[in-house]
């Protein structure tokens, strides 16, 4: 897929990132992954992110990622697949090239590992990754990888395949400056944990879409919320927030890492044998699994 086509696709609807199932031996469970991705692709997602943050990119060995991308492409039909990418520059370039070879339609460049970097370093890192591939690139503005508007503008001037900006910083003043500065040069994606909680504020800042984690196990509800948001049906959004998203947030906030583990729990409760999360994350307790089951039952009725 050409980068500009991917840019158009990204802005066309809701996005999500499937969990990565692990089998009894701890390895990638391709059969379950294909089944789950095929199910998700039957709903209205504009694109799916393979080996993204909720797909436990941080715990995957780089050589596991191409197989995950190939499996997603095989199962998703016409739904574009974007691969997670990250770590230091050399590793990120290697992952990006392998993902492109595996058939990814684009990459999401997640924050580099641990250490802070100046704007000049972030510029060089992102430019080198963009220059290494021909497919579209989205940058994820979060944690130790916060781009300022002038840095992003310089990147847009020299990287034609940089087509998306995803924000998980919550710094609305900065992201509004970025969307005002870059205009339609980029597609803007909300990327806060449980993005629906922040979707209205991000929409006002020019972010027309976001990646929904709960789409993994309640896709119909996730699509309903997105459509209500885009149609300006605030009362419907408020009802869904109160009935589902705030109770889910309460479960998610019970432990660090549950932004991923709670999603994987929901997928297991939906009937897909997604297996455990990889360390250093931990799975929900039996009590918390019961809480998730009750919440899902309340919205399934």
From Swiss-Prot:
GO terms for molecular function: 4-hydroxy-tetrahydrodipicolinate synthase activity; 5-dehydro-4-deoxyglucarate dehydratase activity. PANTHER family: 5-DEHYDRO-4-DEOXYGLUCARATE DEHYDRATASE 2-RELATED, DIHYDRODIPICOLINATE SYNTHASE. The keyword Nucleotidyltransferase does not apply. Its EC number is 4.2.1.41. SMART domains: DHDPS. HAMAP family: KDGDH (MF_00694). Belongs to the DapA family. NCBIfam families: KdgD, PRK03620.1. Keywords: Lyase. It comes from Chelativorans sp. (strain BNC1). This is Probable 5-dehydro-4-deoxyglucarate dehydratase. One of its GO terms (biological process) is D-glucarate catabolic process. It is an enzyme of class 4 (lyase). The keyword Acetylation does not apply. Pathway: Carbohydrate acid metabolism; D-glucarate degradation; 2,5-dioxopentanoate from D-glucarate: step 2/2. It catalyses: 5-dehydro-4-deoxy-D-glucarate + H(+) = 2,5-dioxopentanoate + CO2 + H2O.
């Amino acid at each position: 897929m050409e980068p500009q086509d991917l840019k158009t696709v990204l802005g066309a609807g809701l996005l999500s990132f499937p969990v990565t199932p692990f089998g009894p031996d701890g390895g990638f469970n391709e059969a379950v992954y294909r089944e789950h991705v095929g199910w998700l692709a039957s709903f209205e997602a504009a694109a799916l992110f393979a080996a993204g943050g909720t797909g436990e990119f941080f715990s995957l060995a780089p050589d596991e990622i191409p197989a995950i991308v190939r499996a997603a492409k095989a199962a998703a039909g016409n739904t574009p697949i974007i691969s997670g990418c990250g770590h230091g520059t050399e590793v990120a370039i290697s992952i990006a090239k392998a993902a492109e070879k595996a058939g990814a339609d684009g990459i999401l460049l997640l924050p580099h590992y641990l250490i802070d970097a100046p704007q000049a370093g972030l510029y060089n890192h992102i430019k080198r990754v963009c220059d290494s591939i021909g497919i579209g690139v989205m940058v994820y503005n979060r944690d130790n990888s916060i781009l300022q508007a002038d840095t992003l503008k310089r990147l847009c001037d020299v990287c034609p395949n940089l087509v998306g900006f995803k924000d998980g910083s919550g710094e609305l003043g900065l992201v509004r400056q970025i969307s005002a500065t870059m205009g339609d040069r980029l597609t803007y994606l909300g990327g806060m944990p449980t993005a629906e909680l922040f979707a209205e504020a991000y929409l006002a800042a020019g972010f027309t879409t976001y990646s929904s984690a709960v789409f993994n196990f309640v896709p119909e509800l996730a699509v309903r919320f997105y459509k209500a948001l885009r149609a300006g049906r605030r009362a419907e959004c408020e009802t869904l927030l109160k009935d589902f998203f705030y109770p889910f947030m309460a479960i998610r906030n019970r432990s660090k890492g549950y932004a991923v583990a709670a999603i994987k729990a929901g997928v297991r409760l939906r009937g897909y044998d997604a297996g455990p999360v990889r360390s250093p994350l931990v799975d929900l307790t039996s009590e918390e699994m019961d809480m998730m089951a009750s919440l899902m039952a309340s919205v399934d009725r």
